[in-house]
Amino acid sequence: MVVFSKVTAVVVGLSTIVSAVPVVQPRKGFTINQVARPVTNKKTVNLPAVYANALTKYGGTVPDSVKAAASSGSAVTTPEQYDSEYLTPVKVGGTTLNLDFDTGSADLWVFSSELSASESSGHAIYKPSANAQKLNGYTWKIQYGDGSGASGDVYKDTVTVGGVTAQSQAVEAASQISSQFVQDKDNDGLLGLAFSSLNTVSPRPQTTFFDTVKSQLDSPLFAVTLKYHAPGTYDFGYIDNSKFQGKLTYADVDNSQGFWMFTADGYGVGDGAPNSNHISGIADTGTTLLLLDDSVVADYYHQVSGAKNSNEYGGYVFPCSTKLPSFTTVIGGYNAVVPGEYINYAPVTDGSSTCFGGIQSNSGLGFSIFGDVFLKSQYVVFDSQGPRLGFAPQA
């Protein structure tokens, strides 16, 4: 999964959301496969910047130690698992772009022909189709924890994912973009799958692609199967029973803030019996790490030999040779287990024997973020009816 952390500004007092128009056709379900993008040149990853971006995405405070580590580049690495990146092809206007699907935001933004040649070099870019409509006076802007950002104009255009097309879908075309995004040649933008109330277009928020097309689907849901070091899938409109074991366990979603937020009933570390300490958190495919309350994080790393919270590296680190315990989240009586190897995120620098943890503090956010470290172990159903989330171990 590409490390491409996003930030969404939570807008209070949103005005009426503008809906796009789905193409009328028989109800259906379809699967869209992520594609592996071989990285010809080793890609550097600033580990504390990834962490900082995740905190900023939800309005959290980035600790000074994390800021310092991110700015100094003390933990910049090119880990082997990023030899490939896993993105999803989407046809926007007349161009196919490789986008990052993000259940933690509600914007569809893309590299566009409004950027300079140097900014768009190496990227597939959105060119408004002949039938596209520019929304005069409408703008969007995002800002990230490492100081990067993007902004631009808004168009209504055709967007196709798998077997479903939305006409007059809001497309946020980048006209200004920071160098951090320009350098990520494998990613052409983002498709948000949170609730439309979170959309950041001004002066009037727009509907997400999923909210536009869900009336076309057999069921108004999508299911996510992210994989550990392999391409995953997104199923729209149906549940694929072949992709999980046993039965799905559902948790109610509180979408009052626009997120897929749920409450877990407890957690456990390694072979220990899970406790009953509740954890409220957001299921977010656009965040790489698993961010938890300080007490939970400390409990986990207390059982990791040699682990410490490092000011130098901006988070919990440990010897790479250490065998990590699993982390279990209890959801409605179901134990969702993240294997220990998923939590060994990456060496802090090339060739280092110290590794950065995939579990880190949420820095007092007040809720947890169940990012890819967690999601790669589960088949997760995002059901807009309820709304609710369904969980089961991957097959």
Swiss-Prot record:
GO cellular component: extracellular region
Active site, per annotation: D102, D284
Record keywords: Aspartyl protease, Disulfide bond, Hydrolase, Protease, Secreted, Signal, Zymogen
Record localization: Secreted
Main location: secreted
UniProt EC number: 3.4.23.18
Pfam family, one: Asp
Keyword Nucleotide-binding: no
Transmembrane residue ranges: none
Domain Peptidase A1: 86-392
Catalytic activity annotation: Hydrolysis of proteins with broad specificity. Generally favors hydrophobic residues in P1 and P1', but also accepts Lys in P1, which leads to activation of trypsinogen. Does not clot milk
Propeptide: 21-70
GO biological process annotation, one example: proteolysis
Recorded family membership: Belongs to the peptidase A1 family.
Its job: Secreted aspartic endopeptidase that allows assimilation of proteinaceous substrates. The scissile peptide bond is attacked by a nucleophilic water molecule activated by two aspartic residues in the active site. Shows a broad primary substrate specificity. Favors hydrophobic residues at the P1 and P1' positions, but also accepts a lysine residue in the P1 position, leading to the activation of trypsinogen and chymotrypsinogen A.
Protein name listed in UniProt: Aspergillopepsin-1
Species this chain originates from: Neosartorya fischeri (strain ATCC 1020 / DSM 3700 / CBS 544.65 / FGSC A1164 / JCM 1740 / NRRL 181 / WB 181) (Aspergillus fischerianus)
